[in-house]
Regions:
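C-terminal alpha-helical interaction appendages
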Residues: 1-65
């Protein structure tokens, strides 16, 4: 599994736990997010830690909900 896939997989788990979502809803939230798309395309700030990416994603998902 490449790094991008590992990052996205970890973010799905974090979204699932943070928002108490079922796995498919968490996957959908990450897949539909702007950050998730940027990560998938490698167009994100690579200096950010996984925790920082998760915090940004939490904000984005919370706003979308």
């Amino acid at each position: 599994m490449e790094l991008t896939e590992k990052i996205l997989s970890e973010l799905v788990l974090r979204i699932e736990n943070h928002f108490n979502l079922d796995p498919m809803d968490a996957l959908e939230a990450v897949a539909l997010s702007k950050l998730g798309n940027r990560i998938a395309q490698g167009e994100y700030d690579h200096s950010l830690t996984l925790d920082q990416l998760a915090e940004e994603l939490y904000r984005e998902v919370a706003t979308a909900r």
